[in-house]
């Protein structure tokens, strides 16, 4: 079954993951004033497919996209999103490093495309351009955004996966997006269990019924905590 736009609560939808192309779950929060996406996806093609699904459900395009962490499959669609992007300042720091590497190394894009079969599939062997950009707004502290009838809380967390984890909590719907925060460090997948324990404590204290991660499924909160 291909990617689908699933409604999981009154205001929240999830555009489901696609493992062969390493496309993560993308979130969508529909407010009466504006809507927000969670993560920008793997490429402009990923964004286009997501937006097509929104339009098929008569949902407006997001005015804001929050980024859960810097990895390419969550950020390399940023240049193609509608409206503005928002991320932790650590996320922009990592993306700035990628842009510097691209400028210094003419072979960077070729190396990236050949680093994994899922990346080659997503970028159609180079027919789609790789275009990293920085987020429009950097967060140095947590923030709540009133979308109209629903709130998006942008929360910081320790994570064994990256040092820039951003959680997105929708308190009215008791939904929490965590990106890849519970995974080990890429590419070794080494697990820092102290950070994992701190992440679990952070998730436990948030009032949520459903937790949406990056590449798996939609968890009941207790189900995820038992895995951690």
Language-model-derived ranges and their functions:
Residues 49, 77-80, 99-100, 190, ...:
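Short amphipathic alpha-helical segments
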Residues 5-52, 166-181:
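Conserved beta-strand hairpin/beta-sheet module of binuclear metal-dependent hydrolase folds
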Residues 11, 29, 39, 54, ...:
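Divalent metal-coordination and catalytic microenvironments
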Residues 89-94, 182:
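Short, acidic/turn-prone active-site loops that include or flank metal/cofactor-
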Residues 45-91, 204-210:
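Active-site metal-binding motif and surrounding structural segment of the metallo-beta-lactamase
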């Amino acid at each position: 079954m291909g990617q689908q736009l699933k409604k999981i609560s009154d205001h929240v939808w999830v555009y489901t993951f696609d493992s062969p192309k390493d496309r993560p779950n993308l979130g969508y929060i529909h407010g009466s004033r504006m809507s927000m996406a969670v993560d920008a996806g793997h490429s402009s093609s990923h964004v286009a497919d997501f937006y097509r699904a929104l339009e098929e459900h008569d949902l407006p395009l997001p005015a804001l996209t929050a980024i859960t962490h810097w990895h390419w499959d969550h950020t390399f669609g940023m240049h193609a999103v509608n409206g503005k992007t928002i991320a932790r300042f650590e996320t922009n720091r990592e993306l700035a490093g990628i842009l510097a590497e691209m400028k210094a190394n003419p072979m960077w894009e070729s190396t990236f495309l050949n680093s994994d079969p899922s990346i080659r599939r997503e970028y159609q062997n180079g027919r789609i351009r790789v275009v990293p950009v920085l987020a429009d707004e950097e967060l140095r502290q947590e923030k709540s955004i009133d979308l109209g009838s629903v709130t998006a809380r942008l929360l910081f967390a320790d994570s064994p996966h990256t040092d820039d984890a951003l959680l997105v909590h929708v308190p009215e719907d008791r939904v929490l997006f965590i990106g890849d925060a519970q995974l080990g460090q890429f590419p070794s997948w080494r697990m820092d269990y102290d950070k994992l324990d701190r992440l679990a404590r952070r998730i436990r204290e948030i009032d949520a019924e459903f937790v949406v991660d990056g590449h798996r499924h939609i968890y009941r909160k207790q189900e995820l905590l038992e895995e951690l």
